[in-house]
Amino acid sequence: MKIDLLHKPTEYMETVIILQEENGDIDKVEYLPEYLQNAINIVVKQDDFHFKYSSLKSFPFIRSRKRTNIILCGIGNPKELDNDRFRNLIAISVREAIKIEAKEAYIFTGFKNPLSELHFGHMLAEAALLTEYRFNKYLSEPKSSSLQAIHLAMDLKNPHMFNRGVLEGRIFAEATNLSRDLVNEPANVIYPESLAEVAKKVALKYGFSIEVFGLDKIKRLKMEAFLAVGKGSKK
């Protein structure tokens, strides 16, 4: 999944995610086109929707014979927003985007960001990539997440730190998803020898050193729990 900053306005946006503070003004959301502001204001008023923390609402909007999916997500009081709460909001929003089979999502923010740009990028990338994870390797008709890109429409003082955060978040998410893959594999696929091979490939990919212990050294180190698990496999 591509995650980046929106450098210039685009004429058509397939899916729009609005992260808005409670009692905030949609008309003041950075870079959000006026026609979308008007549409959102109408729905918010008609449905009496409030942007309380983790509140969610999605609806379609048609303009010039093109459909835009709009996802509203409340952040509540921005002063209470921390890394974990923000990560949860991204997960909620991305999950909804995947549910409606969005391919490209644009995130707009209607609050004063209390997080550092490094943490903002990190939480955004990590939450998005963890949310889209699917283990469908053995399905007859595997279906991956439709979401291919997320663009952030936000004025940042230091885009470099945001991009660095996105990179860090991506690394964290990829590591977690790798662990998920290993746990989800059956015992006849992941056993001590094959696990060592996976570890070697990961070390080569990310550039860190690795030492694979043999049976004798594992016994000398008294890694009894590891040995007990390994005995569950014929290999």
What are these regions (language model features)?
Residues M1-K235:
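Short amphipathic alpha-helical segment within the helicase RecA-like ATPase core
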